[in-house]
């Protein structure tokens, strides 16, 4: 009798690419590519900006999945990138899920990178990267929010792997870099005062633009009552940036803090509508 052939688990793979340009005083589509589980939808907007909603049609990621996103915002464009739903990161039996995002913004362009939260499940494994190249006079807002399980669903996360790698450059010069790693006993790590102090929801906001100093006071006032959260202003390689770290007890509390901050940095515009659907 012949031995049964080993069958590798099916894994999700997807690649999406969007190019935006200006035309008729509006930001318009110049190129769109979708493959595998990566989908991009462009809802109607009622101003000069463009909004793109990213969809992972596999319904989440697990070990071995691969997703790649690439976005080009042309001169003078205004592009908002968000996701249809929170990205669920499920238990990984083998390997690590990899999600890579690349964004380039040309002269006088602006991009808001505002995905909804990533939800980590117990024994999940995700390695994520964000690479951004800005023209010297382009501006950029980025948010990444993470939930270590969902309190309302009674979920707990004991162990797993989460890596987040950011590199933001302007005119080729590095203006922001960070490497976050939660590995092994995430529950014990997150309980430390210097990490999350037992909280299960956290986010990072980065804003690169000339008007950082004017926006800073209101951000500091908004975060003053949240002991584990804070905001700072830096000048790096000729560019101003704001970095805000937000920690909350759960996802609902995190959104209550984040939405006013995002609206302030977007000059009064709220979060993408898909966040509220």
Swiss-Prot record:
GO (cellular component) term, any one: cytoplasm
Chief location: cytoplasm
Record-linked InterPro entries: UreD
Compartments where found: Cytoplasm
Keywords: Chaperone, Cytoplasm, Nickel insertion
Single GO term (MF): nickel cation binding
PANTHER family: UREASE ACCESSORY PROTEIN D
Function: Required for maturation of urease via the functional incorporation of the urease nickel metallocenter.
Name by which UniProt lists this protein: Urease accessory protein UreD
């Amino acid at each position: 009798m012949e031995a049964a052939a080993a069958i590798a688990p099916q894994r999700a793979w997807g690649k999406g690419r969007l190019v935006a340009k200006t035309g008729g005083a509006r930001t318009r589509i110049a190129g769109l590519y979708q493959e595998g589980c990566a989908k991009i939808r462009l809802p109607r907007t009622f101003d000069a900006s463009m909004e793109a909603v990213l969809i992972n049609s596999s319904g989440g990621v697990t070990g071995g999945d691969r997703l790649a996103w690439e976005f080009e915002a042309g001169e003078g464009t205004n592009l908002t990138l968000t996701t249809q739903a929170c990205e669920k990161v499920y238990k990984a039996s083998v390997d690590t899920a990899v999600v890579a995002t690349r964004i380039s913004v040309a002269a006088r362009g602006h991009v808001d990178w505002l995905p909804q939260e990533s939800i980590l499940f117990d024994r999940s494994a995700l390695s994520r990267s964000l690479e951004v190249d800005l023209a010297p006079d382009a501006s950029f807002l980025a948010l990444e929010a993470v939930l270590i399980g969902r309190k309302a669903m009674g979920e707990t996360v004991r162990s797993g792997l989460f890596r987040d790698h950011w590199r933001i450059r302007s005119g080729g010069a590095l203006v922001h870099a960070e490497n976050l790693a939660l590995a092994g006993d995430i529950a014990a790590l997150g309980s430390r005062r210097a990490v999350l102090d037992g909280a299960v929801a956290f986010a990072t906001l980065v804003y690169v633009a000339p008007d950082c100093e004017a926006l800073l006071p209101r951000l500091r006032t908004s975060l003053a009552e949240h002991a584990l959260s804070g905001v700072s202003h830096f000048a790096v390689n000729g560019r101003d940036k704001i970095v805000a770290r937000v920690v909350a007890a759960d996802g609902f509390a995190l959104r209550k803090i984040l939405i006013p901050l995002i609206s302030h940095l977007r000059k009064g515009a709220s979060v993408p509508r898909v966040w509220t659907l």
